[in-house]
Amino acid sequence: MSKISAKLVKELRDRTGLGMMECKKALEETNGDVEQAIDNLRKSGQAKAAKKAGNIAADGAIVIAQEGNKAILLEVNCQTDFVAKDDNFTEFANKVAELALANNTTDVAAISELDYGNGQSVEEARVALVQKIGENIQVRRAKIIEGDNLASYRHGLRIGVVVSSEGGQEDSGKNLAMHIAAFNPVAVNDTDVPADILAREKDIAEAKARESGKPDNIIEKMIEGGLRKYLDEVVLVRQAYVMDNEKKVGDVLKADGVTVKDFVRFEVGEGIEKKQEDFAAEVAAAQAAAAQ
C-alpha cells in the first residue's frame, strides 16, 4: 500500500467535507486514487451528508408529541421552509419526537442513538434523509413537560407551545397556549424571572435613567418604572390577554380558576445566526483564486 500524503488527504477533505481520518481511510482503500475515493464515498452516502453538514440549518419545524401526562417539544432544523414542508422531513421529525418521548430523553446525542426501525438508528435515518432531500438536517433540541392537564398549540411549523395547568374550562389550556405562542413570555410570575435577566434589565434601565441627568431619587423611580415596564412585557400574568387585550392574563386565570404550573415554548431557529452572503466579496475571492 502506497503512503498517503497530507496533500491528498487535504484535497479529498476539501472536496467532500469529511474529516481527515475518514479521508485518509478512503484513500488507503483506493491506494491514493482521489477520484475513486470520492466515488466510493458517494456510493456510501458519506460525502454528500458530510458536505451538507457545513450548511447552516436555521429553518425547520417544531413538533409536539404527547402520551398520557407527558408531552415533548422537538425542534428539527433544515435550510429552507420548502424542505420543512416536505412529507419525508415531517415524517422523520414526528417519529423522532415520539421515540424521544417513549424513551424519556431530551439529550440530542442520546436521541441520535435510538432505534429508528428498519435496522437504522435515528442518526443513520437522518443521514439518509440528508442524502435524499439534499439539505443539512439536524435534531437541535427537545424538552419534556409533565402534568395531569396538558394543552398544546402549534402555530404553523415554526412555533410550538405546551402548557401544564390546573383548573379552568376545557378550552382554557388551549387558549393559554395560543397566548404564549403569540406573546412569548419568559416566566409565569415575577418571581420566576431569572435573576441574571433581571440584573441585566436593571443595568439597562439605570443607564438610560442616568442619561437624563436628574437627581438620584428621580433616577431610582425611573429605574423602577423601567423594570416594571419590562416585567409587563415578559411575565405571563402581567401581559394583556390575546383573546381580550382589555384584560391581563392574571385576571383571566383568576376568574377561570386556572393555575399555570409550567410551560414550554419553542420557535424555529431561536439563537441560530443565518449566514449572510456577501456576493461582492465572493466574486472578488473567486477572481483572486483564478489569478493565482
Curated annotation (Swiss-Prot):
Location (main, coarse): cytoplasm
Region (Involved in Mg(2+) ion dislocation from EF-Tu): 80-83
Signal peptide region: none
Recorded GO CC terms: cytoplasm
Pfam families according to UniProt: EF_TS (PF00889)
InterPro entries assigned to the protein according to its UniProt record, in alphabetical order: EF-Ts_dimer_sf, Transl_elong_EFTs/EF1B, Transl_elong_EFTs/EF1B_dimer, Transl_elong_Ts_CS, UBA-like_sf
Gene Ontology MF, one: translation elongation factor activity
Subcellular compartments: Cytoplasm
UniProt entry keywords in alphabetical sequence: Cytoplasm, Elongation factor, Protein biosynthesis
Domain of life: Bacteria
PANTHER family for the chain: ELONGATION FACTOR TS, ELONGATION FACTOR TS, MITOCHONDRIAL
HAMAP family for the chain: EF_Ts
Similarity remark: Belongs to the EF-Ts family.
Role according to the record: Associates with the EF-Tu.GDP complex and induces the exchange of GDP to GTP. It remains bound to the aminoacyl-tRNA.EF-Tu.GTP complex up to the GTP hydrolysis stage on the ribosome.
The protein's name: Elongation factor Ts
Gene: tsf
